């Protein structure tokens, strides 16, 4: 599974920590960060790369996570979540089939970020009754 990473200048240090953690865990990483671009361009790069192939997940880091969440959810086929805790990261995979999360580096510290990422990338999609909501989300954008 490939994990697409992106960050703006405010999130780059935490993104690098996440990148190292995921590489140590054996994941293939594609880092699309352009440090000279703002969160909008970097979020679009992550979301588009995730949508290019099945089985990809994305993680975007900026200062607060809210802006990238708003950008990502504008793209057709993208279900994204802004997360700042492990349980939400895990559950958004299980119930929403989220393919991307956004994290705020000024909200989430290094150890919590690792736990969030681990929950997200290892969380299975439950399907079943949850697919109805996923289909509804996909019809919206």
From Swiss-Prot:
Pathway: Carbohydrate metabolism; D-galactose 6-phosphate degradation; D-tagatose 6-phosphate from D-galactose 6-phosphate: step 1/1. Its EC number is 5.3.1.26. Coiled coil: none annotated. Keywords: Isomerase, Lactose metabolism. It holds the Pfam family LacAB_rpiB. The keyword Isomerase applies. This is Galactose-6-phosphate isomerase subunit LacA 1. GO terms for molecular function: galactose-6-phosphate isomerase activity; ribose-5-phosphate isomerase activity. The keyword Isomerase applies. One of its GO terms (biological process) is D-allose catabolic process. The lineage of its organism: Bacteria, Bacillati, Bacillota, Bacilli, Lactobacillales. Belongs to the LacAB/RpiB family. Heteromultimeric protein consisting of LacA and LacB. The gene is lacA1. It is an enzyme of class 5 (isomerase). InterPro entries: LacA, RpiB_LacA_LacB, RpiB_LacA_LacB_sf.
